[in-house]
């Protein structure tokens, strides 16, 4: 495979970021890309998000990691992968095409708290127990959030998804998100992100220069 062909340092699990929303009860089909039969809204959330043990339908990810590691040379690393909480909710609510949104609504915070954070916490644990050295959070819609909401949200991620797994959870966002705000949130929290990924459109030299200050 690519690891042998190109001598990459790491392998990463790619499992569609929307599987957790399907696990929670949303009807997801592929035609050819992912399509929800019904999008999430305040009025239907309690009716749609009904699965009592959603993590059980994600156990295939652990098996995929274990099987991949059986084939990896000892000097190669294995990285797990989940979608960011807001990104999952943005796609589930058909807001993922928007550049910006207004404030996160109270019902959206409730969905994050009651459904998405708990499932993703278990999802991270599942992948780490299967042998992943690190799990990356891919938050491709985080740029939609206003600065105040982004700050609150990042602290929630650090509390709900990172604190239990020191040095094992990284974070990536893109498309104009403020990396200054991401680094600030991580630096100020007792258990920071294990690593922060940067958009390919951003000069990594600029990030390094700022981090030296």
PLM features: what roles do these ranges have?
Residues 29-126:
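Active-site-proximal, glycine-rich beta->alpha crossover segments in alpha/beta enzymes
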Residues 62-65, 144-158, 180, 200-212:
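Active-site-adjacent beta->alpha loops and helix N-cap segments on the catalytic face
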Residues 123-181:
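Aromatic-anchored, glycine/proline-accented short structural segments
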Residues 17-28, 81-101, 130-153:
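Active-site-proximal loop/short-helix segments
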Residues 1-30, 155, 159-160, 188-191:
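N-terminal basic, low-complexity leaders that serve as flexible interaction/assembly modules and, when applicable
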Residues 9-13, 78-82, 135-137, 169-173, ...:
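Hydrophobic faces of well-ordered beta-strands that scaffold small-molecule active sites
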Residues 162-213:
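Catalytic-face loop-and-helix region of soluble metabolic enzyme cores
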Residues 4, 121, 128-129, 184-189:
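Non-catalytic positions within long, well-ordered alpha-helices that form the structural scaffold/packing
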